[in-house]
């Protein structure tokens, strides 16, 4: 009886996820006087560091489109530096110095690994304001931010729990840091809420963006376990392609890929960065 009731709510859960574009962001301010900053006309040049392509149908593209939409609304110019490795402090320094030379007085770093490099750059340029997405360390001119994505993760877990026929659900994750573990926990709690018999199988790639590794890990998961739905925490949508090729459904992340996977993407936890960037810039 209980499972039947949850089955009737399936469409409602999907609709809620579709409407839940994450705009309730967690933002830790390092005592930035934003009103004073906005008096400076140089603010209209904004710099952005991205660790890969802006056309990944995932994490980076979601940020890029958010910045572009915010720029149109605010009339600012966005200066991008792409393919800046987030584990290379010298590359971060060089890209940051280039952005500063172009007149940027706000610089956004959109990958977790930029932390150490951004802190060092901020120490050298106290007049510049830095914003680190998914970061953990602040400074007088460095703030960190992220969103309450665990809310959408929980709902997508409910959708997976209602949809699975095998009671085996996969989750391919990048690395065991707080934001990833929090998402896995929320997703699993959502699954268990509607289907206590279902099991979530987690596999790690130890990388945000390594397509071949993601493909290998996902294929092995689907071969070893009777998984019929796969979720993920990776930068791109590569996993959705693998799931589709192997006859499983996928739960997307970061970006709306319904047009690309109309029959096999069950739902997605999607970012709407425009709202946040429009407010912050």
Model-assigned labels for residue ranges:
Residues 18-23:
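Hydrophobic core of alpha-helical transmembrane segments in multi-pass integral membrane proteins
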């Amino acid at each position: 009886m209980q499972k039947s009731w949850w089955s009737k709510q399936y469409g409602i859960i999907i609709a809620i996820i579709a409407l839940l574009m994450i705009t309730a962001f967690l933002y830790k301010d390092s005592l930035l006087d934003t009103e004073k900053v906005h008096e400076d006309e140089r603010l209209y040049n904004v710099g952005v560091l991205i660790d890969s392509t802006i056309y990944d149908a995932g994490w980076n593209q979601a940020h890029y489109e958010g910045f572009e939409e915010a720029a149109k609304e605010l009339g600012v110019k966005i200066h991008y530096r792409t393919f800046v490795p987030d584990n290379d402090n010298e590359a971060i320094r060089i890209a940051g110095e280039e952005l500063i030379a172009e007149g940027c007085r706000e610089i956004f770093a959109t990958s977790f690994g930029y932390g150490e490099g951004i802190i060092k750059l901020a120490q050298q340029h106290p007049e510049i304001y830095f914003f680190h997405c998914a970061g953990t360390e602040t400074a007088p001119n460095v703030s960190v931010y992220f969103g309450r994505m665990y809310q959408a993760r929980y709902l997508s877990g409910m959708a997976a729990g209602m949809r699975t026929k095998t009671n085996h659900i996969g989750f391919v994750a990048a690395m065991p840091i707080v934001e990833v573990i929090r998402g896995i926990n929320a997703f699993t709690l959502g699954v268990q809420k509607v289907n206590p018999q279902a099991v979530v199988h987690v596999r790690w790639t130890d990388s945000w963006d390594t397509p071949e590794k993601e493909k290998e890990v996902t294929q092995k998961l689907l071969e070893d376990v009777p998984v019929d739905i796969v979720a993920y925490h990776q930068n791109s949508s590569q996993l959705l392609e693998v799931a589709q090729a192997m006859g499983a459904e996928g739960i997307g992340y970061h970006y709306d890929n319904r047009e690309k996977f109309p029959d096999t993407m069950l739902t997605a936890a999607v970012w709407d960065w425009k709202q946040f960037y429009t407010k912050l810039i």
